A protein has these predicted regions:
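A cross-family phosphate/adenosyl-ligand binding-site feature
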Residues: 1-181
Length: 181
């Protein structure tokens, strides 16, 4: 059985799609998932009316108390988990990782995991230049203009050791080697 650590940041963009895929993977494949949230991850899940879903689908999830609380970096670093997935990752999270700042549970998990051999997969939401469409908490389509600095940081992230940037939520099926059907 595979063990996956899944970190959720404060990104509303791609949160619903990512969440649905992770639930599908858990239900169909029996993959053990340890879910942890940044403080803003909690805020966004509540704003998108997904908080009760999380409580039902992943009842043992962990909320950030500080950069190393709850303690998850150690088990990630020593290979207790087969992969660390951060999805979706905000521009703020990506900027911190790229600049070596590990002051949240998510950025600290990435920094410490990168020192070991556990692979890290990050779904950075700001990867493409121009305007992208996303869904608001009210279910309406809205356009977001990507800032050059955020796209540039996503490109830098892709060059970092032991980190793979994934392009879309459905790529998670492929990295875990599970079927979409």
């Amino acid at each position: 059985m595979k063990r996956i650590a899944w970190g959720i940041t404060g990104s509303g963009d791609l949160i619903k799609e990512t969440y649905d895929i992770m639930v599908d993977i858990k239900k169909k494949n029996g993959i053990e998932m340890m879910v942890f949230l940044s403080k803003e991850g909690e805020t966004v899940l509540k704003w998108y009316h997904m908080w009760s879903d999380l409580q039902n689908d992943f009842p043992d999830f962990k909320k950030e108390g500080g950069p190393n609380s709850p303690f998850i970096a150690g088990p990630l670093q020593v290979g207790h988990y087969d992969a660390l997935i951060i999805a979706p990752a905000t521009a703020n999270t990506v900027a911190k990782i790229v600049n070596g700042i590990s002051d949240t549970i998510v950025t600290n998990a990435v920094a410490q995991t990168a020192k070991g051999e556990t692979p890290i997969f990050i779904l950075a939401v700001d990867q493409k230049r121009g305007t992208v469409q996303t869904i608001s908490p009210q279910g309406k389509t809205m356009n977001l203009k990507m800032r050059e600095i955020d796209v540039s940081n996503s490109e830098k992230l892709a060059q970092m050791e032991n980190i793979t940037v994934i392009g879309k939520p459905s790529d998670i099926y492929d990295i875990l080697g599970v079927s979409k059907d």
